A protein has these predicted regions:
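Structured segments of extracytoplasmic/periplasmic soluble domains
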Residues: 1, 97-101, 241-244, 259-266, ...
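Flavin (FAD/FMN)-binding glycine-rich loop and adjacent Rossmann-like elements that form
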Residues: 1-259
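Short, flexible coil/linker elements and helix-boundary hinge sites characteristic
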Residues: 6, 16, 29, 103, ...
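Generic serine detector
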Residues: 42, 76, 129, 188, ...
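Long, well-structured alpha-helical subdomains associated
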Residues: 250-282
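Extracytoplasmic Gram-positive cell-surface binding/anchoring modules and repeats
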Residues: 269-320, 324-355
Length: 357
């Protein structure tokens, strides 16, 4: 975190500093051959991207900025320590680049953010980790088209996400050979509970970036709003297992979902049914059965899902109901874009209830 001190706080030039490492972090006179020509922002846009209150700035810049690639898992503890020290050094080189090359000499590491000797965070931010083989594996297709997959994972969701599929690979040696994954468009999505539960290990719940997801979809499930919800779901799952004296994989998904709803958490990301809506929990439960299905879309940076909660229900939207109660389909005559009245809806529900009783 940088802070504007209102005076020149330029640090001494770090050992081995090479401005070419960061030349095309933004549009400036030293940027000649950018790795990503279509993504060169102005320096003002770059620095304000992570602007915070109190004259502070988060520096988390993927475009030839302070990203640093390390495969820590393959290293010994001693090697990890050395690699992380160099990663810190690399960050300080980028800070110096901002100060010396771009003229932001009043910005320096905040002295009132982290109580560490070097003013850097306690731990590095990891974008990727080793991942488990879970009871289910969530991938890009489940986010793009949740209702057409063989696995009906949308029925088991315990968290939501709406960030693009964002991969930072240009600091990886050999990134030129990788596919272009830049902000692959997706709708917002729900994350299934089975991604937290290892397939072959009893009594363990996994969270953060080690859940059972594909490499590609990890580009969005890794985001902090998602992993915070994963932690909440993991806590609910563990508590229910202890309370009911059950194994982790024996706990009812619905019990976990109810615990999350009781805490005003989301199962599915409906933009038109906010948590303040009196029907919020009901719509979340209906969506989690698939009786009503959300409509996902991508609009520029915005990844969305809408339930059309304030729109008249169409006959074609009842397919999900007949998946759950197939016998009711024989009694239903409307099709396509024919509208469903309240009286017809009540009659249909009564017939289902009578048959169930």
């Amino acid at each position: 975190i940088l802070k504007d001190y209102g005076k020149d706080v330029t640090i001494p030039e770090p050992e081995g500093y090479d401005p070419k490492e960061f030349a095309c972090a933004c549009a400036n006179p030293v940027c000649i051959t950018p790795k990503e020509p279509d993504r060169v922002w102005s320096k003002e846009m770059m620095i304000t991207y992570g602007k915070l209150p109190n004259h502070k700035y988060m520096i988390n810049w993927p475009i030839e900025g302070n990203d640093y690639y390390i495969n820590l898992i393959e290293m010994s503890p001693e090697e990890r320590g050395k690699a992380l020290e160099y990663a810190k050094h690399y960050t300080m080189c980028f800070v110096y680049f901002l100060q010396h090359e771009l003229g932001y000499n009043t910005l320096g590491l905040a002295d009132d953010e982290y109580p560490t000797e070097d003013k850097l965070p306690f731990i590095p931010y990891h974008r990727e980790s080793r991942r488990i083989h879970g009871l289910v594996r969530f991938n890009l297709n489940h986010a793009l088209n949740p209702y057409t997959q063989d696995e009906k994972l949308y029925r088991t969701c315990i968290a939501v996400g709406d960030y693009p599929v964002d991969h930072h690979h240009t600091r990886y040696h050999g990134y030129e050979e990788l596919p272009n994954l830049y902000f692959h468009p997706i709708p917002s999505y729900g994350l299934p509970l089975g991604t937290l539960i290892p397939k072959d290990v009893d009594g363990l719940i996994v969270a953060e970036k080690s859940i059972s997801v594909s490499n590609i979809i990890n580009g969005t499930t890794r985001l902090q709003p998602v992993v915070l919800q994963i932690g909440q779901a993991a806590g609910a799952l563990a508590a229910l297992a202890v309370k009911n004296n059950q194994k982790i994989d024996e706990v009812s998904v619905r019990d976990v979902q109810n615990a999350i709803l009781d805490a005003k958490g989301y199962l599915l990301p409906y933009l038109d049914v906010p948590v303040t809506d009196v029907k919020f929990a009901s719509y979340q439960r209906i969506g989690s059965t698939g009786i009503l299905k959300g409509e996902g879309k991508n609009v520029d940076w915005s990844n969305q899902t809408w339930l059309r909660a304030d729109t008249v229900l169409l006959a074609s939207e009842l397919d999900g109901l007949f998946d759950v109660y197939p016998a009711s389909k024989d009694e239903w005559k409307k099709t396509g874009t024919e509208k469903l009245s309240i009286a017809e809806a009540v009659q249909l529900v009564r017939k289902i209830a009578d048959r169930k009783s």
